[in-house]
Amino acid sequence: SGELATVVSKIIGYEQVVDDTDNWHEKAAIVGDPSTSGISCAITAENIGAVMEQYGVEDVRLKTSGGSYDSWMVDQLDEGVNFFNYRGYYGVSGFTNNDVDAANNGFKLPFATVITCGTGSFGSESQCLSEKFLRAGSSVSPKGAVACIGTATVGTHTMFNNAVNIGIYYGLFAQNLQTAGESLVAGKANLYQNYPSNPNNWVTIFTHWNNLMGDGATMLWTDTPVVMNVQHQNNIFQGDNYLSFNVTNPNGLPIEGALVTLMEDRSDFYLEGLTDSNGDVVIHLNDSETNISENIELTVSKFNHKPYLYDIEFQEEIYVPYASVETSSFNDSNNNGIMNPGETIQLSVPIHYDGSEVFSTMTATLSSDSEINTVFDEVYYGNIENGTNNPDQAFIFSLSDFEKHNTSIELYLTLTNS
């Protein structure tokens, strides 16, 4: 249970960017030791470093000569780097499990790849190097890596190791893959692409020997996480039937494609939406979900953006009037019950209220981001009281002659009282 708590803490801390100091997300330590397995190990390291630099990594540390590889790797891990890569030979140039334990990198946890003999032999060793990278530290004092790819057995071969290693980072950067598991698949795919005839069954063998210690769904940082500014209401009231959000970057520019999710502790409540080109998203609550009973957990996430977390507080004693699609009705021009292009629609929207307060002389205004022509966009409800409140007349609007089939038209009702 202690090891599991450590791993969970490391992954959550990594994904939530608990530590964003020292520009460590821009640092990568790449080793290619040619002393035993040959110059191709150095060339592999140079290739990986070049790919990282091409795709924006600012501080790529490359070591391919000069000895003292083990102490160099200890220093890099201890300082805190985003990527830690080794290509060399059995024994990892003297770098051991003890060296991982000696590091104090905290939540500056790299994605580690140690592609050589014996680093991923989890079935035959008490704790192989890839396991140590994942398990190192504690839940409150982490160290090591957030995930690590290693290679099982002492029978690996240089050319296949090189292909897997290059493919991992080509997948992450050139192919825009996002997770630890995807990067491993990319390494294996590159192996197959380079040796499609599967000579002596080596492709099959190496796709089994290379393995991941960690959660395959861990989203890896390939750039410094962007901080998102999220505008939203801090409370939700009885009767609220939608929540709106606006997401921007530190320069105030909209962030498109951010995933906004809403959750309660109860398992059946989960809603999500993606921000548009203006950074906006509206998440609708249907009737079954307006009966919210506790705070809502808001999470806004996007690749290479720091997640935004917030608890929207549920105000149990405060009720607001609301409209419902289920109780609204409309009349269309040809009375077929379907809104068609060019038709004029009469829309009747009752207002429901579950509280005890009385809202006097209430009016409602209809608006939309869709291409509709409003003929009568304001109606009078009088007093809004507990129960169902009907308007004195319907809203009237017409659809464009060019409206597409099955288009979703969002209508907004703004209530005001004197």
Spans of model-derived segments:
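Short acidic/proline- and small/hydrophobic-mixed sequence motifs that coincide with surface turns
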Residues: P254-E256, S356-M362
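Cysteine-dependent hydrolase recognition
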Residues: S1-P307
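Intrinsically disordered, low-complexity Pro/Gly/Ser/Thr-rich segments with frequent PxxP/GP/PP motifs
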Residues: L271-L274, N278-V282, N373-E403
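Short, solvent-exposed loop/edge segments of extracellular or virion-exposed proteins
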Residues: E326-N335
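Terminal connector regions
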Residues: N291-N295, V300-Q315, I396-S418
